[in-house]
Regions:
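The feature represents the membrane-entry module of six-transmembrane cation channels
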Residues: 1-153
């Protein structure tokens, strides 16, 4: 299969895709935290998980319907790609117009961020080896290019 390396990393949850349904349910002033904080939220089991399971994510790539969105943008601060939350609000508007996108790759939330413990660093390294496949997948993904927020221009 064309995207087999990507499917393996998703199945193993080295990369965890964000569930669009969860993203759209977030209030307007919500800010996307690091993956580590989202996993704590997931373990608290307060309803809909922010993440797809590894099997759910792999199935979206395998079905060839381009249901995974991959964000492309520059980080506004070295430690925070979206300090004002403006990118999340823009992404929510885009996703409402593109109901076929079921999951999102957003590096801040889907890859482990510093500081990382050893197992997180190992997962991050494996994810980096195939991360560009998310942007280059001919079958599984759609790229979403977010502009620089007005307040930062």
């Amino acid at each position: 299969m064309l995207d087999e390396r990507l499917v393996t990393v998703l199945t193993n949850e080295d990369i965890r895709l964000l569930r669009v349904e969860w993203l759209l349910a977030q209030r307007e002033d919500y800010k996307i935290p690091r993956r580590q904080e989202l996993e704590i939220l997931e373990r608290a089991d307060q309803g809909l998980s922010p993440f797809l399971t590894g099997e759910e994510a792999a199935a979206l790539i395998r079905n060839g319907a381009r249901e995974v969105g991959t964000l492309s943008y520059g980080w506004l601060l070295p430690w925070d790609p979206d300090p004002t939350g403006e990118r999340l609000r823009l992404l929510q508007r885009v996703l409402k117009q593109r109901p076929g996108i079921k999951a999102i790759f957003w590096d801040q939330a889907t890859l482990y961020q510093p500081p990382r413990i050893d197992r997180e660093q190992a997962a991050f390294d494996r994810a980096l080896d195939v991360m560009m496949d998310l942007y280059a997948s001919a079958l599984g993904t759609t790229c979403v290019l977010l502009p620089k927020p007005q307040r930062c221009s």
